Regions:
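GST-like domain detector, emphasizing the conserved glutathione-binding G-site
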Residues: 2-136, 140, 155
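GST superfamily/GST-like fold recognition
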Residues: 116, 160-172
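Alpha-helical packing segments of well-folded alpha/beta enzyme cores
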Residues: 141-145
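Hydrophobic alpha-helical bundle segments that form small-molecule/ligand-binding pockets
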Residues: 146-162
Length: 172
């Protein structure tokens, strides 16, 4: 896999249907960070190739090469971007508002998104012995998480930080 040299143009390793990659693309655009994108086709198992595993041993997208570093996990990438390129900000101004956005992120990252991951759903189906089990299993947790998310986001409103096209969309 092609990569950026230290100090060169950042390279985002991404899959077009990955919401994790999507949130990093949104953040890079919001912050005006020019970068190259390298497609990693998950359906063709390119994320399992030795070249990609050298970038991210978990074999997950996204991965970002930037400032001489290779970063993985979307929220860690967002935190790095926020700390190294603070303007324009991804997070709102007050500690309470930032905590709210982080809560929303964790609701998606930890409680909702993992169960919609194709590899997790396939594993659930194999355990249950029937294909329909994966959708039932995932739907249960996704509904629960999104319901909590909707309650949390309702307390914001109006600003880019949490409603409409929201920062929590970037951070989840």
């Amino acid at each position: 896999m092609a990569s950026a040299a230290a100090g060169g143009l950042p390279v985002l390793f991404s899959y077009f249907r990955s919401s994790c990659s999507y949130r990093v693309r949104i953040a890079l655009a919001h912050k005006g960070v020019e970068h190259a994108t390298r497609a990693v086709n998950l359906l063709k198992s390119e994320h399992k190739a030795p070249e990609f595993l050298a970038l991210n041993p978990l074999g997950l997208v996204p991965a970002l090469q930037i400032d001489g570093h290779t970063l993985a996990q979307s929220v860690a990438i967002l935190e790095y971007l926020e700390e190294t390129r603070p303007s324009p900000a991804l997070l709102p101004g007050t500690p309470a508002e930032r905590a709210q956005v982080r809560w929303l992120c964790q609701t998606i990252c930890a409680d909702t998104q993992p169960v919609q991951n194709l590899s997790v759903m396939n594993h659930a189906a194999s355990l249950a012995g029937r294909e329909s089990a994966k959708k039932e299993w995932a739907s249960h947790y996704i509904r629960r998480g999104l319901s909590a998310f909707e309650s949390g986001v309702a307390s914001f409103g109006g600003e880019f930080c949490a409603a409409g096209v929201q920062r929590d969309e970037v951070w989840h």
